[in-house]
């Protein structure tokens, strides 16, 4: 089964909690704080495995949760960092944020990695908060929660050759006779609804990967007939083999088929118009094909080579394979994938600058309570142990230093009013 698109949920590991502890050795006077930091939570990492060809592994498991960091220990011992959760994907996988549709990573090369959900840092033990004014702090920090997000995985085939054309022109039949692939073949449209890959060897021992892509129809570039799902696989092929039913047995004119498919390719991605293309005139064993081929060549001109074949009698198949191998040899040093990525401004792995997170916003709930939100304050809230009075006092000091108290006063907050941060409620005290 070929799976080329799937949505999954990721949860990176939370950081381990720091602890509150003190030195109690017999001969160490004024032992002081000895609480260790928590370990780092595991990140969710995607890695390319060239042995994979589909996203089938993600079809049956859609939720992935990485491990939590180990809590800190006494004697200033740091908790163990959790090992990253590594998910293997095939070459050509694009990872997008479902909520924003932002491309997070474009993984092409074997062994290439991308951290998509970052693990939380470990909370600090009470040793970290010791100061001359407070040499024995009796509070510590909870671990930072790991990132959580939904992503979509899209696989663009990394085939050398892509077979394109209208439904029922013989693409699957060709792939089945030149490789060991066993695509579904039937006398009806859209027998192929998922791409099929096959390794092809020519009589002179050259080889390449060929993809049989589902049939295109007019309007495919606008998404008609699942066109977007099919066309995205063409983008990474080096050579397009454009197959045409020269017999006109489906009631279509061969020249119109040729024009429509090329228009759809260009409309979807302008660069596909300049991609090396080999035109294959199939079904030459049928009576009308010879006359149609003459008219077809007159219409498109001598600049476009046409190779007549019959996938039923297998006439001229070897000549077609030689032509494909020659064309691949001619363009072997051209990397169409890189050009496309640069043209749309996509980095293979997205590394973003994280701006200052000190900004916050204040709003009002229907019951009149003040709601404070912002990355920094919410992060501090999650890492504060509210069962510890000293930790609560530290949280209050942090709010003051960020200017939240002054901002609440400016919004009209008075003594005794309710202030909410995430799921917590506080009473504003002057």
UniProtKB/Swiss-Prot annotation:
Mg(2+) binds at residues 172, 192. GO terms for cellular component: cytoplasm. Residues 352-430 form the OCT domain. Residues 118-145 are annotated as: Disordered. It is found in: Cytoplasm. Keywords: Cytoplasm, GTP-binding, Hydrolase, Magnesium, Metal-binding, Nucleotide-binding. Belongs to the TRAFAC class OBG-HflX-like GTPase superfamily. OBG GTPase family. Monomer. This is GTPase Obg. The lineage of its organism: Bacteria, Bacillati, Bacillota, Bacilli, Bacillales.
